[in-house]
Amino acid sequence: MDSRELKDRYVNPYTDFGFKKLFGTEMNKDLLISFINSLLSGKEVVKDLTYLNTEHLGTSEADRKAVFDVYCENENGEKILVEMQRGEQQFFKDLSLYYATFPIREQGQKGEWNYRLKAVYVIGILNFTFDEQSNDYYHHEVKLIDTRTKEVFYDKLTFIYLEMPKFNKKEEELNDMFEKWLFVLRNLSRLLERPKALQERVFTKLFEAAEIAKFTKAEYDSYEESLKVYRDWINTIETAKIKSKEEGREEGLKEGEKIGIEKGEKKKAMEMARSLKAKGVAINIIAECSGLSEEEINSL
């Protein structure tokens, strides 16, 4: 019997299963094309995509294996790597750069070769924030630049980061496809029905693909397991944050207590020195008794 206990109507795209269900299958590649084109804002238009192997090995056995969420190339042979960063990672920028080396290195050719490369795009959908300077700046596009002229030095390596927690627009505030896609990614698993603002054909297909009730038993079981892994991961992150805060608070209390004691002792020493000084005791003797410097005693 197919027993289904999940109450959500739509899949959570932050789960491994959910993300690959929506963006990692040939059947739904038009969803990925629409999403990528919304990110590029017309600077380039992707017409078609070919999915590539998401598992990559380094050039030696010592290299770490890299497994991408989605890896594909467009009709021009340009490589596009899409990663869903589900939890905060201290070195996610380093990870992005490391991942970018794989689609670059695999373009190498034996024999005579002029080293001309196809463009590489690394897209990171982040379920955390890394730029605390601005709450409104959530779409980062990073390229290699000349630090003096601020001009783009190399335009065929692009990193796009989306800080999803910063995107808080409501349905009635959505202005374009980019914002609509971010709204879907941010809210899909919480929605009970398709929002009126999302009437484009691509979203019709997305909501049909995302509906949990239409999953086969095998899909449902895979999603349930993926959701458990995601929730365990989130709980681990939250527990670590709480523990860190508690340790910081405890350390702060200890440090505050230490500072308070030191201030109290200093105050007593100054009162004693002031009293001895008033009685005409020599400065060097007061310094020896109180632990204060002669300069401090002279200033009393």
Residue ranges and their predicted role:
Residues M1-L300:
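Elongated, amphipathic alpha-helical interaction scaffolds
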